């Protein structure tokens, strides 16, 4: 593995997600982005809607719609964190 790859890291995305015809390319893209933040032990992460929007080049409202769709399709779960205005997200597939 090259040093730049180790230094910059990477995310793993399940073929189940990438090959799912029920998921749009935007849903697959945001899911793949989330995978770069996922903890290796339980696939959980916390990243702001603002950061997702900024780094993916889409609006915050689009991010919110995509996250809601991924929850409805049971690809991720999201739970509001106590005492914070953030969500804990878990990748399910």
For the regions a language model picked out, list residue spans one by one.
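N-terminal leader segment of winged-helix/HTH proteins
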Residues: 1-8
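Short, Lys/Arg-enriched N-terminal segment that forms or immediately precedes the first helix
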Residues: 8-22
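Winged helix-turn-helix DNA-binding recognition segment
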Residues: 19-21, 25-26, 36-93
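Pre-recognition alpha-helix immediately N-terminal to the DNA-recognition helix
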Residues: 29-33
